[in-house]
Amino acid sequence: MCIRDRNTYALEGSIFIAGAGVQWLRDKIKLINNAYETEIIAKSTKTNNGVYVVPAFSGIGAPYWRSDARGLITGLTRDSDWKTLVRATVESVAYQSYDLFRSMSKDGLKPKIIKIDGGMVANNWFSQFLSDIIDLQVIRPKILETTALGVAVFAGYKSGVFKSLKEITSLWKKDRDFKPKISKANRNNLIKGWNLAIKRTLV
């Protein structure tokens, strides 16, 4: 992207299934009636009980890039129930984000905070879990649909509605921030389980 006649670069990583995983829970296997229920359900469970969902419904994106990968549910026992499956599906987005940041760190990216957006981050439980897994402060904006906002403001910038990038920047307002709360040992254990699930998916 060119801003003020200067090329500006960014690292990008694709997660193929994020909010679409929640749609799958709602539309295909009928475990929920709407996306908002996932927060209540996740809060009602103490742990994932070792259950992981790898939502590779159309392959898996960065950093694995395997179009032949398919979805997997692992760790099921007789104690597993539908609530565990809902929680594990929501958790999967945080784990996939962790994989992206781990990959980006190898290219020298070491962020101190993360700004999130999109409909899924309205879920307070998920936003906190994301912070716990990536071990960084996560900041949520008041306007969740940042992509749509970005299109609008850049159109406004080009047409002269906004006079400067500083003016555009001032439109972004913080709603809430989330800071890591879980122990290092707990985080490592959760990630270890995810890594095993990924390994099984990629066999």
Regions picked out by a protein language model, each given a short descriptive name:
Residues R4-V203:
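Active-site core segments that coordinate phosphate-bearing ligands/cofactors
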